[in-house]
Swiss-Prot record:
InterPro entries: Aldolase_TIM, RibuloseP-bd_barrel, Trp_synthase_alpha_AS, Trp_synthase_suA. It comes from the Bacteria. This is Tryptophan synthase alpha chain. Keywords: Amino-acid biosynthesis, Aromatic amino acid biosynthesis, Lyase, Tryptophan biosynthesis. CDD domains: Tryptophan_synthase_alpha. The keyword Amino-acid biosynthesis applies. The keyword Amino-acid biosynthesis applies. It comes from Burkholderia pseudomallei (strain 1106a). Pathway: Amino-acid biosynthesis; L-tryptophan biosynthesis; L-tryptophan from chorismate: step 5/5. It catalyses: (1S,2R)-1-C-(indol-3-yl)glycerol 3-phosphate + L-serine = D-glyceraldehyde 3-phosphate + L-tryptophan + H2O. The alpha subunit is responsible for the aldol cleavage of indoleglycerol phosphate to indole and glyceraldehyde 3-phosphate. GO terms for molecular function: tryptophan synthase activity.
Length: 271
């Protein structure tokens, strides 16, 4: 099994839910990314989503857009992000790392070269926001051949056909976007999430992580009651945007620890 699959199997065996925090590589300081990744793990992250900055992050709200702009202005590239993962792996061989980003940087590198470089760096999963599952069979096969889980998004508007298409190519877990719109949106409706997850699981035999709109321990716990994992990004990026540089890692670890405690108080995993 992959590191991601092992992680979710262990969580299920313990009756616990996953915590998947997101930060943008290179923001607020490229030299601090690896330190921040370790802070996430120390705070209780089960999987780390590391954003690859892109100039047109169409699915992201203003907080993550600004984060990408800052990282790009400081010279962050896909190559430097892979180097961050490699340096993280020097100390942490347990915590899975998922790269989340857009197709253009990967296509510039080439899927085969990317798969090899990501494997060698210690990447465990890849979520390419603008790769539709129906057109991703070759890409997903190349990732799986390199031991990397291809992860896909589903949304409240996803049809049964789209869910089935994801089921044909995804592995690791599925990222369910709980709201229409962009990351960081508010007005989380846990009952609608609970209603959608069985439809997903009937067609995709994978854990379901839920993100978009999770901003604190209370919303994280509410989502953990119905999902297999909680994904949180914009709130963490905002925390880093506002934190004093010398306090950023400690504040990040502390906030993630609060989320961890709240999630561990949630009910048993979704059926």
């Amino acid at each position: 099994m992959s590191r991601i699959q092992n992680t979710f199997a262990a969580l299920a065996a313990q009756g616990r839910k996953g915590l998947i925090p997101f930060i943008t590589a290179g923001d607020p300081d490229p030299a601090k990314t690896v330190e921040l990744m370790h802070a996430l793990a120390e705070g209780g992250a089960d999987v780390i989503e590391l954003g690859v900055p892109f100039s047109d992050p169409m699915a992201d709200g203003p907080v993550i857009q600004r984060s990408s702009e800052r990282a790009l202005a400081k010279g962050v590239t896909l190559h430097s992000v892979l180097d961050d993962v490699k340096r993280f792996r020097a100390r942490d061989q347990k915590t899975p790392v998922v790269l989340m980003g857009y197709a253009n940087p990967i296509e510039r590198m080439g899927a085969d070269a990317f798969a090899a470089a990501a494997r060698d760096a210690g990447v465990d999963g890849v979520l390419v926001v603008d790769y539709p599952p129906e057109e991703s069979h070759d890409f997903a096969a190349k990732m799986r051949a390199a031991g990397i889980d291809p992860i896909f998004l589903l949304a409240p508007t996803s049809t049964d056909d789209r869910i089935a298409a994801v089921g044909q190519v995804a592995s690791g877990y599925v990222y369910y976007v709980s709201l229409k719109g962009v990351t960081g949106a508010a007005n989380l409706d846990v009952s609608s999430i609970a209603g959608k997850i069985p439809a997903i699981k009937s067609r995709v035999p994978l854990p379901v992580g839920v993100g978009f709109g999770i901003r604190d321990a209370a919303t994280a716990r509410a989502v953990a009651e119905v999902a297999d994992a909680v994904v949180i990004g914009s709130r963490l990026v905002q925390l880093l945007e506002q934190a004093a540089p010398e306090r950023a890692a400690a504040e990040l670890a502390g906030f993630v620890a609060e989320l961890r405690a709240a999630i561990d108080g949630a009910a048993k995993p979704a059926a």
